[in-house]
Amino acid sequence: MEGKAADPLLCDSLILWLQTFNTAAPCRNVQDLTNGVAMAQVLHQIDVAWFDASWLNRIKEDVGDNWRIKSSNLKKILQGIMDYYHEFLDQQISEELIPDLNKISENSDPTELGRLMQLILGCAVNCERKQEHIQNIMTLEESVQHVVMTAIQELMSKEAMGPSASDVSSEMEQQLKKALEDLQEAIAEKEELAQRCQELDLQVAALQDEKNSLVSENEILNDRLEQLDDSLDDPNTVVAKKYFHAQLQLEQLQEENFRLEAAKDDYRVHCEDLEKQLIELQHRNNELTSLAEESRALKDENDILRAAADKASKLESTVEVYRKKLQDLNDFRRQVKSLQETNMMYMHNTVSLEDELREANAARAQLETYKRQVQELHNKLSEESKRADKLAFEMKRLEEKHEALVKEKERLVIQCDALKETNEELRYSQMQQDHLSRTDASRIKSHDNLAAELLPVEYREMFIQLQHENKMLLLQQEGSENERIMELQKQLEQKQWTVNELGTEKRLNKERIGELQQQIEDLQKTLQEQGSKTEGSSNLKQKLAAHMEKLSEVHDELQKKEAALAELQPDVSQNPQKIGELEAALRKKDEDMKAMEERYKMYLEKARNVIKTLDPKLNPASAEIMLLRKQITERDKKIEALEAEYKLAKLRDYEENLIVTAWYNKSLTLQKLGMEARLLGSGGACRDGPGRSFLAQQRHVTNTRRNLPVKVPSATSD
């Protein structure tokens, strides 16, 4: 008996019995039952009052591969069963029938799982609705019924023995187990503490060694310091000379430090301007970050909708498989019912033949008793015996014929099943051909009607709800795109306004340069008309020489700024902050140019006043004036080149922003097209291609998305 209960056949038979309850959780194999959800639902159906909804809610459904949660669910189920036996049925469960839950949750042991399902079977056959559950057991196969009945007998026999003599021993065993568990925990804690002490000892030893090494190094450094002090006291030593030389270098470095501090103040002002620009760029970056977060949120929602659509398609295929299995099950039940009726008819025939055989034997006994008295009865008895032999022969012949008919029937049933499968395949192929031969409009309509009939009501509602959410998302996305377009238009207007300002400044600079050239020409004419004296020409030469030195300084400063500007030339697509630095450097350069122009005007006024006072007759400074004019033209060319580079940098930035915006808009459009194609489902599939599967449709949408051209608007130059 115990060998049968522990056999895996018991587990498989009880799984078939659990499937008669039609639970929401799957219970097809051992892996489906290890989490305990299906068994808890079966107990809830067995006795709703005892295993109520609150008890059922304590069983966690989202278990996954976590064996601890599985073990917790199984412990709750076993505790509920033991309470039901003890309090409701007033029975005690034998220790041999209690399963090992750890083996079930960790190893999916079918033997221990069979013991647990055997206890659930005991609850079913002892509850108030036991007749209904016994009727359900009788509907199973004969072999499964035999295994289930054997398990019930084993359960009843072990419950009948009772644990009256083993209560004390079981309590002692439990106390002993608990004491052993406490002892193991204490030993584990002791080992952990010992390991921790060993680690601390190693750390203390390492710190002690480090301390000793530091003390020795400190002593060595003190000795070296004393030697250096002794050597510095003597001025003739090499160390003293090096010390004095170091003092001189220190003074020079201090003077250079003063100069660097002055330059630092200038750079501090420049840094403040850059910080202001950085704050503005940070505000702009925050706005772009918020827009990026919104786009990521929309992308996440799109992924969720895509996952929901995939899940819906998988559930549809699962429903189709279950529907086919249900049809096969109904056919099998009808066949079993017809076989049972035939078996009952054969049993009635056998009983009638046995009754006739008993009557013949009784008649034979009577004929033997009256054989000596009546000879006629003897003859009659012989005739009856012959008749009985004939009937026995006929019965044997009928049995052989019955066996042949049974075999022929089995063969015909197998052929019938094969013909049914062939018929189903031919019908399915015929339906496909009819479906391919219809027109596009009728094909779309029939496909939609078939999908509507196959889809359950809850999936239809979910599909309609997803369509509504898709429309709402499209409206929201269009609003966000309009806002993005408005912002880009504002930025474009601001850029154009900045370009216009720069053009105005350039025109004013050209006018100023023209005025300066006119002043130089006037000065040259005045010098040619009036001439110069020797003393006045020497003073004018000194003034012009000073002026030329300052112009050379300005030219050197301009070259330095050009070098700094070349170093600050950014990669606009990678670091927009460098663009701000370049603009700040350009503005500072313009300010420096304005300051140089003011100084130049001041020098011209001074030179004109000197010329008027001296009234020269000669023109010795014409060469210097021509050189000055040439330097001014070179400076104008450099200014124009820098302005052109600045415009190119701004145009490059503007083009990249437009490319990013166009790519963003195009990706959103493609995502909307892909979402609409997936949500339209079969309708879109019929329009695209009549014989295309779901995966082929997805590949077609992906290829269409890749083949769509991306148009980037060209940047307009001012």
UniProtKB/Swiss-Prot annotation:
An example GO CC term for this entry is: cytoplasm
> Which UniProt keywords are present, listed alphabetically?
Coiled coil, Cytoplasm, Cytoskeleton, Microtubule, Protein transport, Transport
> Major location, coarse class?
cytoplasm
What InterPro entries does the annotation carry? CH_dom (IPR001715), CH_dom_sf (IPR036872), Hook_C (IPR008636), HOOK_N (IPR043936)
Q: Which residues form a coiled coil?
A: 164-428, 473-652
Gene Ontology biological-process entries: cytoplasmic microtubule organization; cytoskeleton-dependent intracellular transport; early endosome to late endosome transport; endosome organization; endosome to lysosome transport; lysosome organization; protein transport
Q: Where is the Calponin-homology (CH) domain?
A: 8-124
Q: Which Gene Ontology molecular function entries are recorded, alphabetically?
A: dynein light intermediate chain binding; microtubule binding
List locations, semicolon-separated: Cytoplasm; Cytoplasm, Cytoskeleton
Report the family membership. Answer: Belongs to the hook family.
Subunit organization: Interacts with microtubules.
| Function text | May function to promote vesicle trafficking and/or fusion.
The record ties this protein, via PANTHER family, to: HOOK PROTEINS, PROTEIN HOOK HOMOLOG 1
Q: Specify the protein name.
A: Protein Hook homolog 1
Natural source organism: Gallus gallus
Encoding gene (name)? HOOK1
